[in-house]
Amino acid sequence: MAIAMTDAELKARHRRMWASGDYPSMVETFLLPLGPRLVGAAELSPGLRVLDVAAGTGNASLPAAETGAYVVASDLTPELLDAGRARAEAAGLTLEWVEADVEDLPFEDESFDVVMSAIGAMFAPH
């Protein structure tokens, strides 16, 4: 039996789900190797403008910032961005954290050299 819901309802459900658990701990346990691998595959270098879509707590954003790239981490869930901001601060990294919907990003076309997403973009309904 399918449950019909609007995109807005689905996104609100995702936002609540990601904010309700201990996602940062889960990242540390299961997903930590994924970010550096993605960054390595993207061959980032100093000065590149990088957007991490559905960045969560910065699993890929932080390793991207370590390359010297200018990084913007965007996510639908402010609680995850807060956790990422704390991780970045503890690591001495500077990057921008932006609450944003992957389906309605607030950036001009061609604002970035590289756009990446570790796993989060797959949750967007379209």
Map each language-model feature to its residues.
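N-terminal, positively charged/glycine-rich alpha-helical extensions of SAM-dependent methyltransferases
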Residues: 1-19
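Conserved alpha-helix/loop element of class I SAM-dependent methyltransferases that forms part
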Residues: 28-48
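Residues lining the SAM
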Residues: 117-121
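A short, conserved alpha-helix within the catalytic core of class I
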Residues: 124-126
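Class I SAM-dependent methyltransferase SAM/SAH-binding core
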Residues: 49-105
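Class I SAM-dependent methyltransferase Rossmann-like catalytic core
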Residues: 21-26
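A short acidic, Gly/Pro-enriched loop at the edge of an enzyme's catalytic core
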Residues: 103-115
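Conserved donor sugar-nucleotide recognition element shared by glycan-biosynthetic enzymes
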Residues: 7, 27, 31-35, 77-80
